[in-house]
């Protein structure tokens, strides 16, 4: 009986070690690859349109732990997540100056374009929670997404170009939406304390379209698909009335990039008619 117990103990211990080693694999393999700046060719976005109360899932359920294929897939996902740490993001931002990719040559056609994700949050004008897609539906929208002051600054260059002397915040062809991503609970708490200060820095007429949304609503791998994972940069989406992403940009904007984006907005306005 003692021999049987010892054998079972050895088996249990070896299984635990194998199980643990399996899930430590992402940490061991977390060697980041150097970021390569490429021009966008394929549409960016999600396959399904946003809808209220949708919750994007991340990771495996308890039952999935016993599914070999799903577990291996999750391990690969974790390898990517561990590799792209905060230090990696900072180094990449410094190397690229926030220009993580180059905008497409032209906008994506409606039948090929993918959807903007569901996001909920509050605006500067109201404490009530709402869904961002509700204000996007039926309109052409230029959306700024940022989490930091530097991301806010460089993404604003696509709206206001001091070199050209143009301010498109009041452009009649579209609406401009600001989405300030709150990274975590600490930042959310700090924002509550400094909300009045933030309101004073944003023109009152912009408060209705300035959203505060928790970044964690969109899981890591979904942010990878949307190309918005680097917290230091700022991003621009052009979204059509059907909630599809038709154009995207990031990082600082040159005069040519500024003009390209607003040319796209003009073309989509004609398409709408």
Swiss-Prot record:
One of its GO terms (cellular component) is mitochondrial inner membrane. Belongs to the ATP10 family. The keyword Thylakoid does not apply. This is Mitochondrial ATPase complex subunit ATP10. Involved in assembly of the mitochondrial F1-F0 complex. InterPro entries: ATP10. It holds the Pfam family ATP-synt_10. The keyword Membrane applies. GO terms for biological process: mitochondrial proton-transporting ATP synthase complex assembly. One of its GO terms (molecular function) is unfolded protein binding. It is found in: Mitochondrion inner membrane. Keywords: Membrane, Mitochondrion, Mitochondrion inner membrane.
């Amino acid at each position: 009986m003692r021999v049987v117990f010892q054998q079972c103990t050895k088996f249990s211990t070896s299984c635990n070690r194998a199980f643990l080693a399996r899930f430590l694999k992402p940490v061991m393999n977390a060697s980041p690859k150097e970021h390569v700046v490429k021009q966008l060719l394929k549409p960016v976005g999600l396959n399904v349109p946003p809808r209220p109360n949708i919750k994007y899932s991340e990771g495996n359920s308890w039952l999935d732990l016993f599914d070999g294929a799903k577990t291996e897939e999750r391990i690969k996902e974790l390898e990517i997540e561990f590799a792209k740490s905060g230090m990696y993001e900072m180094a990449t931002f410094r190397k690229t100056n926030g220009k993580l990719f180059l905008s497409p040559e032209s906008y994506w056609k409606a039948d090929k374009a993918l959807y903007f994700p569901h996001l909920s949050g509050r605006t500067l004008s109201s404490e009530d929670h709402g869904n961002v897609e509700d204000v996007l539906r039926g309109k052409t929208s230029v959306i700024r997404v940022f989490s930091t002051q530097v991301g806010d600054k460089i993404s604003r260059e696509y709206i206001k170009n001091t070199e050209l002397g143009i301010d498109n915040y009041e452009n009649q062809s579209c609406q401009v939406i600001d989405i300030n991503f709150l990274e975590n609970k600490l930042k959310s708490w700090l924002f509550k304390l400094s909300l009045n200060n933030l309101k004073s820095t944003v023109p009152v007429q912009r408060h209705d379209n300035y959203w505060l949304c928790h970044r964690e609503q969109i899981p890591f791998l979904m942010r990878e698909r949307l190309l918005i994972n680097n917290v230091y940069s700022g991003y621009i989406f052009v979204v059509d009335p059907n909630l599809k992403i038709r154009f995207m940009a990031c990082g600082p904007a040159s005069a040519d990039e500024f003009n390209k984006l607003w040319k796209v907005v003009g073309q989509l306005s004609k398409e709408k008619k």
